Amino acid sequence: MAQQEAEILRPLANFSPSLWGDQFIKNDSDAKVRYIFHYVDYTNLSMLTATGTKMVDTMNLIDTLERLGVSYHFEHEIEEILQQFFNLNTDYNDEAYDLYTVATHFRLFRQHGHRITCDIFGRWRDENGKFHEGLKDDAKGLLSLYEASYLRTRGETILDEALDFTTASLKSIAPNLESPLRRQVEHALVQQLHWGNPRIEARNFISLYEEYEDKDESLLRFAKLDYNLLQMMHKEELHEVSRWWKELDLVAKLPYARDRVVECFFWAMGVYHEPQYSRARVMLTKTIAMTSIIDDTYDAYGTIEELDIFTEAIERWNVEEMKRLPEYIKPFYKALLELYEQFEEELAKEGRSYATHYAIESLKELVRSYHVEAKWFIQGYLPPFEEYLKNALITCTYCYHTTTSLLGVESAVREDFEWLSKKPKMLVAGLLICRVIDDIATYEVEKDRGQIATGIESYMRDNGATKEEAITKFFEIANDAWKDINEECMRPSPHSRDVLMRILNLERIIDVTYKGNEDGYTQPEKVLKPHIIALFVDPIQI
């Protein structure tokens, strides 16, 4: 067999090994951590509901709770308060409200789906429609407006202009600011709050908040304790999936594929970090890890004949298909079917076994698109951009991962899965962002491997564009898609915030993973390694 393999020309990618080895198979966290959350309390919660507390003070507290990553403890109270405040129809043209306050309130309302108008920023523009130059002296106001502008939707030109103005202004004044404001501005310019992973942002803000002169010491301690408790829970789950991965032994059986189960868990944690989603995180991690194997089989190993057979086997979804498969992929196919059998048994207990049907159908669609992509590569075919994009929106895996992210979410019902299967506007926006950002980050590596059927190459040929022009266009596509996501998160919606937030959070993980045009999943050393250490290795000192 070795001689036969040597005669087969395979498109090997020679991926780097896992950074983590067996590090997370060893688990030293407290197994009772799940129960500690019942006893965690914050004594100053009364500030949220205290009679006579000013709206501005309450909104600032909500903002602080969210930035510190502890707002999930008070989710219902915060939703009720924001609804009450929104119903007040506050006149933000009143001079009593400064830019910092107005922009913060705007962002909080939009983050929670309330359709507040962007016209409230009009009073900070001159007769020519330009933002007042004097605002450059208001660093906090600029930062707040900068963060608010990322909640914009299509047609909100005032927020487009606000983003340009605040970005340039903050870059100009940042070197002259004092910390912690300087650190906060510098971080915001690299990682936008609305696009960031909530846990990463929480860890960063905890260190900033510690430097605030007016910090609430008890709230700070609570945030640190909560962060460490959640970290312990996440480490337990990472231990579970690492052990599962080790027992499958796919790293040894399929050495051509990326060994990234830790990075897969990082993605799942980004979709939902709260304690009640523990099962969902484990299930999603497993589906991402298995998809990664499939991706690499099509992209970096299988011959067209082997992939023809494997595609048919996935389509038929029957253990009997193993007889036809190449030897190397049989253990994986068996493990994949068994995984979904376990999911179905688990979900049947709560009357949700139908969810696995939608996940499997989405996986079949993904594999069909991988197959098309593989044939393009092998045939040296560069499709027109429209043809490329139609297929590539599926191979970015966002559609499949969005579907599987709801498997372990008890509140996700049949109507939610049916909605996703029809590719709604919000999902398509997510697909676009994932696709073009991935294409930008992986272009040079794929080009070096001889891949010509890439989005950048296709767009360049169809439009007579340079690489730089194509990349600029792809970023424009992503920015417009973010506007669509913001619009679809507005109330009213037939779908719960619980479901919508999974789509949004998965998009945030894309932004973090491909930060700086790097493929942080394939090469995690630079981009993801520091985050993984902060989230799953190093606790915060209390």
Swiss-Prot record:
**UniProt enzyme class:** lyase
Which Enzyme Commission numbers does its entry carry? 4.2.3.-
Spell out the molecular function terms from Gene Ontology: beta-elemene synthase activity; germacrene-A synthase activity; lyase activity; magnesium ion binding; terpene synthase activity
Where Mg(2+) 3 binds, per the record, is at: D438, E446
Question: What is known about the tissue distribution of this protein?
Answer: Expressed at low levels in leaves.
| InterPro entries the record matches | Isoprenoid_synthase_dom_sf, Terpene_cyclase-like_1_C, Terpene_cyclase_plant_C1, Terpene_synth_N, Terpene_synth_N_sf, Terpene_synthase-like, Terpene_synthase_metal-bd, Terpenoid_cyclase/PrenylTrfase
User: What cofactors does the UniProt entry give for this protein?
Assistant: Mg(2+); Mn(2+)
Q: Which UniProt keywords apply?
A: Chloroplast, Lyase, Magnesium, Metal-binding, Plastid
Plastid as a keyword of this entry, yes or no, is yes
- In its UniProt record, which GO terms are filed under biological process? diterpenoid biosynthetic process; green leaf volatile biosynthetic process; sesquiterpene biosynthetic process
Q: Show the GO cellular component annotation of the record.
A: chloroplast
Keyword Magnesium in the entry? The reply is yes
Q: Which positions does UniProt annotate for Mg(2+) 2 binding? A: D295, D299
| UniProt motif (DDXXD motif) ranges | 295-299
Question: Pathway it acts in?
Answer: Secondary metabolite biosynthesis; terpenoid biosynthesis
Q: What is known of its domains?
A: The Asp-Asp-Xaa-Xaa-Asp/Glu (DDXXD/E) motif is important for the catalytic activity, presumably through binding to Mg(2+).
Give a short account of what the protein does: Sesquiterpene synthase involved in the biosynthesis of volatile compounds widely used in aromatherapy and folk medicine, and present in culinary herbs. Mediates the conversion of (2E,6E)-farnesyl diphosphate (FPP) into germacrene A and beta-elemene. Not able to use (2E)-geranyl diphosphate (GPP) as substrate.
Entry similarity comment: Belongs to the terpene synthase family. Tpsa subfamily.
What is the recorded name of this protein?
Germacrene A synthase
**What is the organism field in this record?**
Lavandula stoechas
